[in-house]
Design a protein with these regions (language model features):
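Repeated loop/turn-to-beta-strand initiation elements of outer-membrane beta-barrel proteins
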Residues: 1-4, 35-39, 109-115, 143-153
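Residues on the lipid-exposed face of transmembrane beta-strands in outer-membrane beta-barrel proteins
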Residues: 27-31, 40, 101-105, 139-143, ...
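Outer-membrane beta-barrel "beta-signal"
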Residues: 174-188
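Transmembrane beta-barrel architecture of outer-membrane proteins
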Residues: 20-24, 96-98, 134-138, 177-181
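Extracellular/periplasmic loop regions
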Residues: 12-102, 166-168
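Transmembrane beta-strands of outer-membrane beta-barrel pores
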Residues: 8-14, 33, 42-48, 117-123, ...
């Protein structure tokens, strides 16, 4: 079954010296292909050269990102949520445009695999570094050990754009970031 969802968020207001004026739009859809499922999403939020005056969500104001994306390095995402860039949909007030896709493959009844790709661009220049945050590729496997008990492992690679290397993120002066992750979790 094909599914489509999305949202439109319109923010207006101030908290202390910070404004959160702006809007965001997300469209997401998925379609089965045999036993596999292909999903994609596009998101755009407005920003400001002064991130204290740009679009922010409640998560952004609380310095959290929420699980909203498919990627592992640029965004918080389940088993890799340890040392990611923590992009929330407002990109800290700079605004964000991203296009992402994933493929979910059931290998057996208890084992599944997922591969993903995502492209990220800041709505406004991040300092003097421009807008290109980068592109990410990754994948993971998930094994159901018992009912609600899962073992997950994966890896991800991000090619950083100039804006992705700034101190607003990890302050990494590298052209890429690599990550290997795993999680053993009881889900209920």
């Amino acid at each position: 079954m094909v599914d489509v969802n999305g949202f439109v968020v319109l923010n207006s207001g101030e908290v202390g010296d910070e404004s959160n004026d702006g809007f965001g739009v997300k469209v997401e859809g998925g379609i089965p292909v045999g036993k596999m499922r292909i999903s994609g999403m596009a998101l755009m939020t407005t920003g400001d050269e002064d991130p204290d005056k740009g679009f922010k969500t409640l998560e952004g104001m609380l310095s959290t990102g929420g699980y909203w994306a498919y990627t592992y390095i640029f965004t918080p995402h389940g088993p890799s949520d340890v040392n990611n860039y923590g992009l929330e949909i407002g990109n800290g007030g700079y605004g964000l445009t991203t296009i992402q896709a994933k493929l979910d493959v059931p290998v057996t009844d208890k084992l599944g695999a997922q591969v993903q790709v995502g492209w990220f661009r800041s709505g406004e220049d991040v300092g003097a570094s421009g807008k290109d945050l980068g592109t990410e590729f990754g994948g993971q496997v998930k094994y159901e050990v018992a009912k609600n008990l899962n073992l997950e492992a994966g890896l991800a690679f991000a090619s950083l754009g100039d804006a992705g290397k700034t101190s607003s993120y990890q302050g990494v002066d590298e052209s890429s970031v690599k990550e290997i992750f795993g999680r053993f979790q009881l889900e209920f």
